[in-house]
Amino acid sequence: MSSSSPSSQSRLSVPGRTPHLPPLTIPHTVSAEGLATPNTPHALLPTGLLMGSPFVQSPTSYTSMHGLPFSTTQMAAAPAHPTTGYNVSRVTSPNVANFAPGYFPLPNNTTQPVKTVYVGNLPPNTPIDEILSCVRTGPIESAWILPEKNCAFISFLDPSHATAFFQDAALKRLTIRGTEVKVGWGKNSASNSSVLLAVQQSGACRNVFLGNLPNGITEDEIREDLEPFGPIDQIKIVTERNIAFVHFLNIAAAIKAVQELPLNPKWSKRRIYYGRDRCAVGLKQPAYFSKGQVGVVGGYPVMGYPPPSPVLQKPDLIMTGNRTVYIGNIHADTTIEEICNAVRGGLLHNIRYLQEKHICFVTFVDPVSAFRFFEMSNIHGLVIRNRRLKIGWGKHSGPLPSNIALAVAGGASRNIYIGNADDSLTIERLKEDFEEFGEIEYVNFFREKNCAFVNFTSLASAINAIDRIKQKKGYENYRISYGKDRCGNPPRTNSKSDVLSVSSDMSMPVDLVVPQQGISGFMPTNSNI
């Protein structure tokens, strides 16, 4: 059996294909609450902060579409687009090669998990939004339709989601407008690196959220302003909430819209960010619970890209890229200090405790750390004051602000170290002098070591304090720098109950760091050391 593929030029001209992207920036500013909001362009979080995470492991082998392991050597030696060894018996249509260029049935010896699904035998004039309404297995990178061939191609972010859709459509005999469609595998192609980076760091997807819309705005008006960024799949307006969701046919177009739409004076005062891909609504039970059924390793199977992050292997985080974890069912007498004593696994960007509502929102610097805390707390449970807490995902935090990312790369944390402390320095004085820079979580003083620590609820407040505290009278002779955020320590479990818990014994200096060169992860800033 033979099949023809279009030239590279014709492939690029197909509507809905992922276009070339310039170096990526994501609009944002920092609101009064310290949360990222999209308004002005800034550089993304340095990749080292995520890809350098100790939780990101390089895979030693991958799994083929038939569940057979193969090595990276075999992968590198294999052709990018296999054209021989197809199992003809698996072809869903005997004449499928004549239906659409670029279509390939499932090969026997493929060395890359395939992420593009072919949908053929479509009824004439079928709109692509009806086709995508049948997809519920995971977020889509791009989709395009060839009306003259009565077929469409759907390219997923994760090959396991493509396989799940393929199997589901084949088993249930997918029907559109009363016609049973044919499913097969499309030709594999590399994902755009800028798109992968945006998915990894910002939770980018095809869906663009529009908030704070004026009364009476229409779908036609939204389409007119957003269609220049790329082909649109669907627009949904929620009139009573003055919000809308615009699904593009590819993530690249959504990224461009999020970047450039805030620069339009008409949209400058609107809330613009990523929503949730409607094709991922079926991910109530994450795919990593059923990898054996799918037979495909999650992540991006493209040679030359970084190894997959745990964030990208968990569908809940593919959809959001979230750094904020919700904590509920908190005892009324619990203090923010006790919550921070229980949070472990990564540096905190900020923590917001709503004591009257018995809830708290913890935002990490790294989304991998947020996922790790979320997963550990749900597996082992998190207990404070003998009450098991409820753990969930908070509202999307957005990307880490660039100024915070640069400060973290230089050793910043929300903990301020004050060395050479004398008898004139007291906890009360520290609270009074530092509270002008932001909300303080707690102050710890160690007389025997002549040092103290001031922990803020926000990393931005600590950065502000480091920059300005030396200008305050009486602090000229103190050694001032960043300390160690105790929330970055490994999780602690109760060996008897295997439950994450917090000790009430605060006599140990859990955040004590004596600043000196050579300490891993510590870099004094604006200090007299």
Swiss-Prot record:
Keywords: Phosphoprotein, Repeat, Repressor, RNA-binding, Transcription, Transcription regulation
Stretch list, region Disordered: 1-26
Domain RRM: 115-188, 206-277, 323-396, 414-485
Known function: Negative regulator of sexual differentiation. Acts by repressing the transcription of meiosis-inducing, ste11-regulated genes until cells reach a critical level of starvation. RNA-binding protein that preferentially binds poly(U).
InterPro entries found in the cross-reference section: Cwc2/Slt11 (IPR039171), Mrn1_RRM1 (IPR034195), Nucleotide-bd_a/b_plait_sf (IPR012677), RBD_domain_sf (IPR035979), RRM_dom (IPR000504)
Ranges of Low complexity composition bias in the record: 1-13
Entry GO CC: cytoplasm; cytoplasmic stress granule; cytosol
Name used for this protein in its record: Negative regulator of differentiation 1
Source species taxonomy: Eukaryota, Fungi, Dikarya, Ascomycota, Taphrinomycotina
Residues bearing PTM Phosphoserine: S93
One Gene Ontology term of the molecular function aspect: mRNA binding
Species in which this protein is naturally found: Schizosaccharomyces pombe (strain 972 / ATCC 24843) (Fission yeast)
GO BP annotations listed: negative regulation of conjugation with cellular fusion; negative regulation of transcription by RNA polymerase II
